[in-house]
Amino acid sequence: MDSGAVPTNASNCTDPFTHPSSCSPAPSPSSWVNFSHLEGNLSDPCGPNRTELGGSDRLCPSAGSPSMITAIIIMALYSIVCVVGLFGNFLVMYVIVRYTKMKTATNIYIFNLALADALATSTLPFQSVNYLMGTWPFGTILCKIVISIDYYNMFTSIFTLCTMSVDRYIAVCHPVKALDLRTPRNAKIINICNWILSSAIGLPVMFMATTKYRQGSIDCTLTFSHPTWYWENLLKICVFIFAFIMPILIITVCYGLMILRLKSVRMLSGSKEKDRNLRRITRMVLVVVAVFIVCWTPIHIYVIIKALITIPETTFQTVSWHFCIALGYTNSCLNPVLYAFLDENFKRCFREFCIPTSSTIEQQNSTRIRQNTRDHPSTANTVDRTNHQLENLEAETTPLP
């Protein structure tokens, strides 16, 4: 919204999309945290609490002075999510890149999901500083980057989960077609397409994001054309439809058809081992999708209700909002944990990374030698000829019995 549309009273602190500087910043989990930018900014010390609470600021400390307990809890949450999310998601990406056996179509989609989550958690240090200072000190460029990353994360994640569900449907219900369609190359192309689709919202948001001086602090916020309320609510509704309702319908249809297929046949492929792996991977993807839906449904419902009706002020409402935010946070660091528990290949690769055995080290050295041989064939040929000459010389100089 433009500067003239920025509210100057306490009545907008509680809107999930409004962050006036007169309140203290709310915990902002990956994407919907900064969906507060739909009406507000990053430098709100109590986050989405005042408009939602009917204008009262009794639950919000004054600007720049969050209570010590609140600050400690929120900073601890930021730190845990940031460390676990970055380490876990980068470990997932490393394992997929490092091990040839992990370069399957499903795992390439998982790589895309991990990349989106890692980008989202990388914004938490900026949000932490913003919370403690009660202002945005990083300038306009970083403001644009942080806000756009949040939107990219939300849309790329849900689009990737949709893709994974369709991929599972093809693998289970159309195994013959799957041989041609489910290839790593096609998965990479689809991942790129998902990022391009996400740009339909990510790029406009980047241009809309800006910093504004207000009441002695700097807000990182979105600007909307007049009438502001119309464009704000239109964006909320579009996000609700295209980033929640439609993907959930696609995922539900895919898994409904898969369940019917799995119940109707005992053997999906000609091998019991392949059949077991197929069912295991399908179960893992289903759990990942279910966790995503559980984490994001409350905040989507909350925001769309607030866009349509006025919610009266209650303490329960404030607690509910922060609980929704916390759920959104946890999703960015939960997926690596799910892979570790649900997929034997990921579990084995994680174990090898954390506790390398002698056989693992030998295998890595062997892989490096083979790679060097492919990269430098002339050197390899020279070494082979030298070894052959030494063997001949040794045979010639060895005394006969």
Swiss-Prot record:
Quaternary context = Forms homooligomers and heterooligomers with other GPCRs, such as OPRD1, OPRK1, OPRL1, NPFFR2, ADRA2A, SSTR2, CNR1 and CCR5 (probably in dimeric forms). Interacts with heterotrimeric G proteins; interaction with a heterotrimeric complex containing GNAI1, GNB1 and GNG2 stabilizes the active conformation of the receptor and increases its affinity for endomorphin-2, the synthetic opioid peptide DAMGO and for morphinan agonists. Interacts with PPL; the interaction disrupts agonist-mediated G-protein activation. Interacts (via C-terminus) with DNAJB4 (via C-terminus).
> What family does the Swiss-Prot or TrEMBL record give for this protein?
Belongs to the G-protein coupled receptor 1 family.
Q: Which residues carry this modification: Phosphothreonine?
A: 373, 397
GO BP: any one term: negative regulation of cytosolic calcium ion concentration
Extracellular topological domain residue ranges: 1-69, 133-143, 209-231, 308-315
Where is the PTM Phosphotyrosine found along the chain?
A: 169
A cellular component annotation (GO) from this entry: perikaryon
Residues recorded with modification Phosphoserine: 366, 378
The subcellular localization recorded is:
Cell membrane; Cell projection, Axon; Perikaryon; Cell projection, Dendrite
Q: Note down the stretches annotated as region Disordered.
A: 365-389
Glycan-linked positions: 9, 12, 34, 41, 49
Q: Name one GO molecular function term.
A: morphine receptor activity
Q: Which InterPro entries match?
A: GPCR_Rhodpsn, GPCR_Rhodpsn_7TM, Mu_opioid_rcpt, Opioid_rcpt
The protein's name is: Mu-type opioid receptor
Q: Which CDD domains match?
A: 7tmA_Mu_opioid_R
Membrane topology per the entry is: Multi-pass membrane protein
Cytoplasmic compartment segments: 95-107, 167-186, 257-280, 340-401
Post-translational modifications reported in the UniProt record: Phosphorylated. Differentially phosphorylated in basal and agonist-induced conditions. Agonist-mediated phosphorylation modulates receptor internalization. Phosphorylated by GRK2 in a agonist-dependent manner. Phosphorylation at Tyr-169 requires receptor activation, is dependent on non-receptor protein tyrosine kinase Src and results in a decrease in agonist efficacy by reducing G-protein coupling efficiency. Phosphorylated on tyrosine residues; the phosphorylation is involved in agonist-induced G-protein-independent receptor down-regulation.
Renumbered to this chain, motif NPxxY spans 335-339
- Family matches, as SUPFAM superfamilies: Family A G protein-coupled receptor-like (SSF81321)
Q: Where is the lipid attached (S-palmitoyl cysteine)?
A: 354
